[in-house]
């Protein structure tokens, strides 16, 4: 199954790998694309992350 079909706008995710200092933060997906998602962090910052860099929170 394609990665982008596993995530929806509004899903809460946690950052597990990153090149910046946002590892461990919980964010909300605001845009889903085939190769990446835009994730809004709690401080209001919006970052692009590829699918291996974040994981869905257990609902």
Task: Give the residues covered by each predicted segment.
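Basic/aromatic-rich interaction segments and small domains that mediate binding to polyanionic partners
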Residues: 2-59
